[in-house]
């Protein structure tokens, strides 16, 4: 519990080892933990590799940056999207990643749930993948991104949002999916803002 708190506030951790006469007191400043949601590189000239580790708030925007950086080194003739051991995450992140490679207004995923709001279709359109900003980070992607031959890598650790991306790209014949059977989670998370700025709630939906 000592680890939790507002960013830039101070606290201490106290460690007591077996046989130690005095405890070890370590002061530290709390900070926001930033997890990299992806990485990329050129496997060889003309062939790009993008790994998505987890689907977070800014995953699709991060993907756009990686793709732009890859195309800055020259046109691609092939692209590998690695979703192995990606446990998934936020629904709009998977819609955004899918939208980077699919034609506009293409169906990405349908969700179902106990309430009418949970029953809906998500398309490859900014209204369905933008959250908290109206800046469309996919608008200026290199033209070749929509047509470059693709392979998506998956395994038993690929779940939730990563399964949505792999399934959407495969169903629309946009990419070949290679690897082993995925986890089969069948649910995703969405973030709902609460009133009076008291926080946010995480909600699960079945896909």
Task: Indicate where each model-derived feature is located.
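Cleft-lining beta-strand/loop regions that shape enzyme active-site pockets
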Residues: 1-195, 206
